């Protein structure tokens, strides 16, 4: 069998744009605000407090009150990672302990 009788191999590559994690930023003050809305496709969510003030988070059907809910300490983070039977697709509200413009980074796992 000569080399011309062998099947030709073709190099293939396939690139898919990564959509996860999807990042966003919320700036919080001393009033409860929506930090992220509901997403049916969300498998998990990570909240990162890169600021110097404590931030409190609650599901969007509640009003955030400082210190009453999921507390994210300064330079800390909180992760909610789903599985086949648990998802974290609700919206979230947040509030800062004091001041304004306090950053909350959000990574959505889609």
Where are these regions (language model features)?
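Beta-sandwich interaction modules
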Residues: 36-37, 73-90
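Noncatalytic modules at the cell exterior or secretory-pathway interfaces
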Residues: 43-45, 84-102
